[in-house]
Curated annotation (Swiss-Prot):
One of its GO terms (cellular component) is pore complex. Residues 1-21 form the signal peptide. Gene3D superfamilies: Porin. The lineage of its organism: Bacteria, Pseudomonadati, Pseudomonadota, Gammaproteobacteria, Enterobacterales. Residues 28-29, 67-70, 104-105, 157-163, 213-215, 255-256, 293-294, 336-338 are periplasmic. GO terms for biological process: monoatomic ion transmembrane transport. The chain crosses the membrane at residues 22-27, 30-44, 51-66, 71-82, 92-103, 106-113, 147-156, 164-172, 202-212, 216-226, 242-254, 257-267, 280-292, 295-309, 321-335, 339-348, 365-375. The gene is ompC. This is Outer membrane porin C. Belongs to the Gram-negative porin family. Keywords: Cell outer membrane, Ion transport, Membrane, Porin, Signal, Transmembrane, Transmembrane beta strand, Transport. It comes from Escherichia coli O6:H1 (strain CFT073 / ATCC 700928 / UPEC). InterPro entries: Gram-neg_bact_OMP (IPR050298), Porin_dom_sf (IPR023614), Porin_gammaproteobac (IPR001897), Porin_Gram-ve (IPR001702), Porin_Gram-ve_CS (IPR013793). One of its GO terms (molecular function) is porin activity.
């Protein structure tokens, strides 16, 4: 009986937000759940910048309040704290923090730090034991977590079509710290939460649509964001008025089998190490997993991001280059719903060459070994 329960629980545990959250309060239409995990994690690699302790923890809550029979308020917050640094360093940050209202079948609207709608599709392949989901990144326009997202979501198409979901999203500008890079000193591009150019974004809009039926899923998402002054005028590659993303994905999740693939094409939106962005990039991720009843979940995946027409890097002109390319082989063993251990081997297929060195892109293999407690 225990092994059968594990086979049912594990897919739920893979969903962001920890499906097995601890209920703290549930009374009079008010509900509060607490969730989190501690990952005792170690990397083994010839790349000394990542080799060693990578321990971290995450803690979050989800809350709901019943305003009326048809209106529900909700909020979520999630925080990450690194456990591999001395106490004198501040290595912690907010992953998500948003609040919203849900109007029964009409849909929901929320605002705050959240996931971009592109991730509605690309998240299907972001399920590896440790690695994966790195053909994009956080604070990368509307591709993953970011600030200032206003999101409308509709589930089951107004209650009329089971499994048909769509979302529309707007992201406000997150610009520079002080505008000191603007020679006109006009102040455009300055925001109260300024950051370096690689993490900035202008106003953006996006949308996604997904359909799930008996274990099969298909989805598509698009986004288009203005780029900031800093992003186009501080010597970074991949300049342009807008950053655009177009993605499509497929998945199968049934009978203990999980298969997923996504293809994304971006313009001025995929980061090239520390150098800037690819004028055009083609990103591909595919993963296959199987859940054994006794708790073992092996995983194999392939990920590639190829930059096109990159331009001049360190005095040399580059056309097409692989930004990321690796095979991932791993496995997770679930002792129960709260305790698991995993190993994940990232087999790096990139060559150590002038381009990867100039961009600061790692070309070494990494083996990750982790022991996880989650609630």
């Amino acid at each position: 009986m225990k092994v059968k329960v594990l086979s049912l629980l594990v897919p739920a545990l893979l969903v962001a937000g920890a499906a097995n959250a601890a209920e703290v309060y549930n009374k009079d239409g008010n509900k509060l759940d607490l969730y989190g995990k501690v990952d005792g994690l170690h990397y083994f690699s010839d790349d000394k910048s990542v080799d060693g302790d990578q321990t971290y923890m995450r803690l979050g809550f989800k809350g709901e309040t019943q305003v009326t029979d048809q209106l529900t308020g909700y909020g979520q917050w999630e925080y990450q704290i690194q456990g591999n640094a001395p106490e004198s360093e501040n290595n912690s940050w907010t992953r998500v923090a948003f609040a919203g209202l849900k109007f029964q079948d009409i849909g929901s609207f929320d605002y705050g730090r959240n996931y971009g709608v592109v991730y509605d599709v690309t998240s299907w392949t972001d399920v590896l034991p440790e690695f994966g989901g790195d053909t994009y990144g956080s604070d990368n326009f509307m591709q993953q977590r970011g600030n200032g997202f206003a999101t409308y979501r509709n589930t089951d198409f107004f209650g009329l079509v089971d499994g048909l979901n769509f979302a529309v999203q707007y992201q406000g500008q997150n610009g520079s710290v002080s505008g000191e890079n603007d020679p006109d000193f006009t102040g455009h591009g300055i925001t109260n939460n300024g950051r370096k150019a690689l993490r900035q974004n202008g106003d953006g809009v996006g949308g996604s649509i997904t359909y799930d039926y008996e274990g099969f899923g298909v989805g598509a998402a698009v986004s288009s964001s203005k780029r900031t002054w800093d992003q186009n005028n501080t010597g970074l590659i991949g300049t342009g008025d807008r950053a655009e993303t177009y993605t499509g994905g497929l998945k199968y999740d049934a009978n203990n089998i999980y298969l997923a693939a996504q293809y994304t094409q971006t313009y001025n939106a995929t980061r090239v190490g520390s150098l800037g962005w690819a004028n055009k990039a083609q990103n591909f991720e595919a993963v296959a997993q199987y859940q054994f009843d006794f708790g073992l979940r092996p995983s194999v995946a392939y990920l590639q991001s190829k930059g096109k027409n990159l331009g001049v890097v360190a005095g040399r002109n580059y056309d097409d280059e692989d930004i990321l390319k690796y095979v991932d082989v791993g496995a997770t063993y679930y002792f129960n719903k709260n305790m698991s251990t995993y190993v994940d081997y990232k087999i790096n297929l990139l060559d150590d060459n002038q381009f990867t060195r100039a961009a600061g892109i790692n070309t070494d293999d990494i083996v990750a070994l982790g022991l996880v407690y989650q609630f």
